[in-house]
């Protein structure tokens, strides 16, 4: 099941166009790598169908997008092992990483835990592309996970990239856009 909330959050069209690929990649990964088979879910006391939640909101000075699945969570030992096998880090480095640091390995170019390419997520676009796209928008991407509970990706973008409602004012043959949040009163001066 896909649950979408926060549909009134506004972003500039060009930003949305740049985020389509990264968001699609995270959603595909949630389906392919996150959600367990119905039999595994039943053994864990979960509903047979997985749930992915897509939520967007404005928090302080940021637009935040959260994509959460109720799947199996991230096996950090497997992540570290895959990074060592692909030559991204040494075994000594892998042994010293905590869970948060292990999650960051997933954003390195060339990283994958997949043994084979799949129809769902194996398109050759990794989380490194997700991260570079979001960073190119002056944002950040992070991940939290609990084994057996699920995984949540957080994308944070500066609100300056969001659509801001403004009052257009013309004075002395110059046009100004004043954010409505800064307007207390409007009066015509003759």
Question: What name fits each language-model region?
Answer:
Residues 2-5:
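Conserved transmitter core of two-component histidine kinases
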Residues 26, 106, 120, 173:
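Residue-level signature of catalytic and energy-coupling elements of molecular machines
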Residues 90-95, 112-119:
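Activation segment
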Residues 106, 126, 130:
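Short alpha-helical Gxxx[C/S/T] motif in the catalytic ATP-binding
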Residues 123:
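Flexible nucleotide-binding loop
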Residues 9, 13, 28-100, 147-148:
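ATP-lid-like helix-loop hinge signature
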Residues 16-28:
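Short acidic amphipathic alpha-helix that forms the conserved interface helix of the HATPase_c
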Residues 132-190:
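Conserved secondary-structure micro-motifs at functional edges
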